[in-house]
UniProtKB/Swiss-Prot annotation:
Sequence segments annotated as region (Disordered): 1-175
Protein name: Splicing factor U2af large subunit A
Biological processes per GO annotation: mRNA splicing, via spliceosome
Compositionally biased region (Basic and acidic residues): 22-93, 106-141
The keyword RNA-binding belongs to this UniProt entry's keyword annotation: yes
Domain RRM: 239-322, 359-437, 478-564
Family: Belongs to the splicing factor SR family.
Molecular function terms, GO-annotated: mRNA binding
Record remark on domains: N-terminal RS domain has a very strong bias in favor of D over S.
Compositionally biased spans, kind Basic residues: 94-105, 159-169
């Protein structure tokens, strides 16, 4: 059968041809349809694989970055540790160097302190005392200024309460701590104990015309030693004598023994039995001494010993440079007693040549080659000389360049000083003045010390009469002003000062400070401070410990006050 016969009855030839053609194409389509999902699947698998590769790559990148960060941090930590170790080493090195340097400095300073021999300590104490005095003066000035000024600042401060811390830091108006001697003396008096008799003090029996007191005398068991010590300081300049021309072998003991024996031999001991000399200071380099006597009168009697032979050579007895004749005249005799037996020690009365007194002239700046006759001739051009002394070196006999003289006519003293002072003598310039002129500048201060001592003695005499009885109330007068009491802040400060200072002496039970009346009515006891103690032990210590102190620049006067009047509120007694 032919090819066409197979399709016979099923269609035309065209259909057969069509079937043949399409039959082959359908196979291809089927093949295509079968391969597409496979391709898509393979593509998907490849894409998935690539995605996984990319994810793995990203993970590896992150791991590398993390490892890098960890490594970097580790390196940073190592670097910081290294730097820290370096800093520690540097710090240790600096500290060792500093300690070594400080040790060397300390050793050097310690050696210097040993070489200075304590001079720095003395300078420090003097500086500290000067600072203390300046601070004390400043406190007095501030309190005085506060009492004179009622400024707006004070009014503003008055409205504010004072804090406890501020109160603690406030400086007390009192100038210094209570003297220990007053505390001890008062304590012994209260308990009925008599303090042991002190050694004989120089100058006992001073102020004979005003208040004679033998050494160690007391009133009612109350020691007068603080007053005696004060008078000793005030009279010391008049109780010392200058002794020049000493031998190299002289010492304090030999000088004191010699002059004590000589004073007894001539009848110059006027202060009672015992040695007239209480202290000796020797300058071995310049061969002179200051000899301190017990009394002003004995020092004046010692002036008659000028030229006496001591250890084989004559010595000069003079007044020291700080001697003030006008002030000494109020303390005792300024001239030797005319009844001294000078012949007993080989002296002739008047041998000193009249070189004492306020009209003695000092002549300094003399050329060393000037002889005694040349100097005397120069001075006598103004009048006759009552006494003359050219000071010479003991060993060489050469002039020391200065002299002393006294004119017979005392009226020419100032004329000669004015004419000769400042004259050129070769390469020297003369200095001519009264010998005591340098100390006259100290007269006001010395007189103040003397006046203060006299006032204290007179006050003690009044307060320590046999009828005076200690009470538990102490009244302080001359302490505060009316203006200070009007101001609330000032009043509070004063009250606090009194409580603090008064409490140092005993159990303080009450403090009363009367204040001015707002209506201007008179108030009893204005300007006084009343301290009430639990017993007379505390009041007695306060009485002697606060008397003479300074509060805000005012000198405190402390007296006992009747207990019955205090309890009644009567402060005007």
């Amino acid at each position: 059968m032919s090819e066409f016969e197979d399709h016979e009855g099923n269609g035309t030839v065209a259909d057969a041809i069509y079937d043949e053609e399409n039959g082959g194409r359908d196979g291809e389509i089927e093949d295509q349809l079968d391969s597409k999902p496979k391709r898509e699947s393979r593509d998907h698998e490849r894409e998935t694989s690539r995605s996984k590769d990319r994810e793995r790559e990203k993970g590896r990148d992150k791991d590398r970055e993390r490892d890098s960060e960890v490594s970097r941090r580790s390196r940073d930590r190592d670097g910081e540790k290294s730097k820290e170790r370096s800093r520690d080493k540097d710090r240790d090195h600096r500290e060792r160097h500093h300690r070594s340097s400080r040790h060397r400095d300390h050793s050097r300073e310690r050696g210097e302190r040993r070489e200075r021999g304590g001079r720095d300590d003395d300078d420090y104490r003097r500086s500290r005392d000067r600072d203390h005095d300046r601070r004390r003066d400043d406190r007095g000035g501030r309190r005085s200024r506060r009492s004179r000024s009622r400024s707006k600042d004070r009014s503003e401060r008055r409205t504010r309460s004072r804090s406890p811390s501020k109160s603690k830091q406030r400086v007390s108006g009192f100038d210094m701590a209570p003297p220990a001697s007053a505390m001890l003396a008062a304590g012994a008096a209260v308990t009925g104990q008599v303090p042991p008799a002190p050694p004989t003090l120089p100058g006992a029996g001073m102020f004979p015309n005003m208040f004679p007191l033998p050494t160690g005398q007391s009133f009612g068991g109350l020691s007068m030693m603080p007053i005696q010590a004060m008078t000793q300081q005030a009279t010391r300049h008049a109780r010392r004598v200058y002794v020049g021309g000493l031998s190299p072998t002289a010492n304090e003991q030999s000088v004191a023994t010699f002059f004590s024996q000589v004073m007894a031999a001539v009848g110059g001991n006027t202060a009672g039995p015992g040695d007239a000399v209480v202290n000796v200071y020797i300058n071995h380099e310049k061969k002179f001494a200051f000899v301190e006597m017990r009394s002003v009168e004995e020092a004046s009697n010692a002036m008659s010993l000028d030229g006496i032979i001591f250890e084989g050579a004559p010595v000069k007895v003079r007044r020291p440079s700080d001697y003030n004749p006008s002030l000494a005249a109020t303390l005792g005799p300024s001239q030797p007693s005319p009844h001294l037996n000078l012949a007993a020690v080989g002296l002739t009365p008047g041998a000193s040549g009249g070189l004492e007194g306020p009209d003695r002239i000092f002549v300094g700046g003399l050329p060393y080659y000037f002889t005694e006759s040349q100097v005397r001739e120069l001075l006598e051009s103004f009048g006759g000389l009552k006494g003359f002394d050219l000071v010479k070196d003991r060993e060489t006999g050469n002039s020391k360049g200065y002299a002393f003289c006294v004119y017979q006519d005392l009226s020419v003293t100032d004329i000669a000083c004015a004419a000769l002072n400042g004259i050129k003598m070769g390469d020297k310039t003369l200095t001519v003045r009264r010998a005591n002129q340098g100390t006259m500048l100290q007269k006001p201060e010395q007189e103040n010390v003397l006046l203060h001592a006299q006032q204290q003695i007179a006050f003690q005499r009044v307060m320590l009469q046999p009828g005076a009885v200690a009470t538990t109330v102490v009244c302080l007068t001359q302490v505060v002003t009316e203006d200070e009491l009007r101001d609330d802040e000032e009043y509070g400060d004063i009250m606090e000062d009194m409580r603090q200072e008064g409490g140092k002496f005993g159990a303080l039970t009450n403090v009363v400070i009367p204040r001015p009346s707002p209506n201007g009515e008179p108030v009893a006891g204005l300007g006084k401070v009343f301290l009430k103690y639990a017993d007379t032990d505390g009041s007695t210590r306060a009485r002697f410990g606060m008397n003479g102190r300074k509060f805000g620049g005012n000198e405190v006067v402390a007296v006992y006050y009747p207990e019955d009047k205090f309890e009644q509120g009567d402060y005007g007694a």
